[in-house]
Structure formats: C-alpha cells, structure tokens
Amino acid sequence: MNKKLYFPLILFLILVFAFAVQLLRNAQGDDPKALESALIGKPVPLRTLQDLFEEKQYGIEIFQQGKPILLNVWATWCPTCYAEHQYLNKLAQQGVTIIGIDYKDKSAQAIKWLKDLGNPYQIVLKDEKGSNGLDLGVYGAPETFVIDGQGIIHYRHAGDLNQKVWDEKIQPIYQKLVERK
C-alpha cells in the first residue's frame, strides 16, 4: 500500500473509534452536555464584579444570603442564551432567585437585551473580560450553577435551561436546598 494512503486511513480509523466510544457513552446514559466541575461542593470563586446597571460592586456575599440561587452565565452574542431567556423569565416569576453574569459582552448591548426581553435576574454582574467565567470553569454560555444559601456550588449545567432540564436535573436539587433552608 502506498505510504500516502496510510495517514488518511489511520486518521479515519481514529475518528471512527472516537465516534464509536461517544455513541457507547451516550447509550449508557452519559449526558454529552454534562461537564464535570471541580467546584461542586466548594464556594463560588467570585471576584468582585460590578453591577451591570449601577456602580455597585458585589462579591461572594451575594451568594451567602441563606437561600438557594441559580447563577446563570449568559451573553447577548449567544443564540442558546436567547433560547433559554424566556424560560428564565418564567422561573423568576415563580420566585426562583437568579443572579446573572453577563459574560464577555458589551454593557450597552446587555442592557438593551434585558430591556427588550425582560430581566429575570435579581442582580446582573458584568464579566467583560471573562475572568470570573474562567474562575467558574465556564466553557461557554449559557451555563447555570445551583448554589446554596452559604455560597456552595451543588450543580452545574452547560447549555440552555429549559423545562425538561429544570424538571429532571435542577429543580430537585434546588428544592432540596429550599427545604434545607
């Protein structure tokens, strides 16, 4: 066989093998969106960040108010964030406390977005450079963290938060934290 054919053939076989491994993981129930987080069971690693609307600065104390919180990392440039936004508004109307981090975004665009689509967040923090997202281990927006009233992370979800994700994954954890309060 010609040496020029070996490299593409080997590359093809590696790709087929990787695809097969992923199919097996999915068949065994592994969620391809599930991302391990070294922060589960640890305090939110929040640096001091500025409020999107005011000159206020916030730190870890906003997560230590004695009640569970959803921390939602989002951006106006993110189409999946747009898809989940209506559901976040619904959760906020139901009394779920949500704090947002506007990730790698321009403040003016974020303010307009929230004005046009509604603001589900009790507080919106700016993370224009993405440094806090990096501390949280964010791979991209949106990501949602379930945090207890002492500021400890209990769950991380990458991707849009919708009814199915809420019912099956996040709400049971959130409800346990509400009852524990």
From Swiss-Prot:
Domain of life: Bacteria
KW Magnesium (keyword) present: no
Cellular component annotations (GO), alphabetically ordered: outer membrane-bounded periplasmic space; plasma membrane
Membrane topology category: Single-pass membrane protein
GO BP terms, alphabetized: cytochrome complex assembly
Keywords: Cell inner membrane, Cell membrane, Cytochrome c-type biogenesis, Disulfide bond, Membrane, Redox-active center, Transmembrane, Transmembrane helix
Disulfide bridges in this chain: C78-C81
Transmembrane segments: 4-24
Intervals, Periplasmic compartment: 25-181
Compartment(s): Cell inner membrane
Domain Thioredoxin residue range list: 38-175
Regions of this protein lying in the Cytoplasmic compartment: 1-3
Family: Belongs to the thioredoxin family. DsbE subfamily.
Protein name: Thiol:disulfide interchange protein DsbE
Organismal lineage: Bacteria, Pseudomonadati, Pseudomonadota, Gammaproteobacteria, Pasteurellales
